[in-house]
Amino acid sequence: MYQAIPYSSTRPWLRPEPAASVVDVVKVETTTAVAGRGGEAEVVGEEEAAEVRRAVAESPVLVVGRRGCCLIHVVKRLLQGLGVNPAVHEVAGEAALKGVVPAGGEAAALPAVFVGGKLLGGLDRLMAVHISGELVPILKKAGALWL
């Protein structure tokens, strides 16, 4: 339980340390973006791309999206409604998809849906395939549905 702190008019309140201001956060993000042109940031991007490649190979259905993106939830709920439990992998940006999508392939938009180790597309493509009735056979062929 929490212990109550007795009130004292003689003892001043200790002010908490100020949180990072928006300016500080923007400076950190800008520094990270500048550092991303070479060196360590590229190595982190390559590690993230390798993680995505491994996850695509392991999962019959994988949803790759940007951290904190609400569209991941939309894709996941659509697939769960069909009886599929997709794996979800959150990444920092679209650079993680470079090694997964073939060089001549279409550009991947996040969230990207991989079915059977192949890129199905983004949310718009998933909705189009679902509405046309082609999604269930694709999921069965990938082994994500057993019905």
Curated annotation (Swiss-Prot):
Alphabetized GO MF terms: 2 iron, 2 sulfur cluster binding; metal ion binding
Positions of [2Fe-2S] cluster binding: 69
- Indicate where this protein is primarily found: cytoplasm
Answer whether the UniProt record assigns the keyword Plastid to this protein. no
Q: Which cell locations does it reside in?
A: Cytoplasm; Nucleus
Q: List, alphabetically, the GO terms of the cellular component aspect.
A: cytoplasm; nucleus
Q: Which family does it belong to?
A: Belongs to the glutaredoxin family. CC-type subfamily.
Role, per record: May only reduce GSH-thiol disulfides, but not protein disulfides.
> What is this protein's record name?
Monothiol glutaredoxin-S5
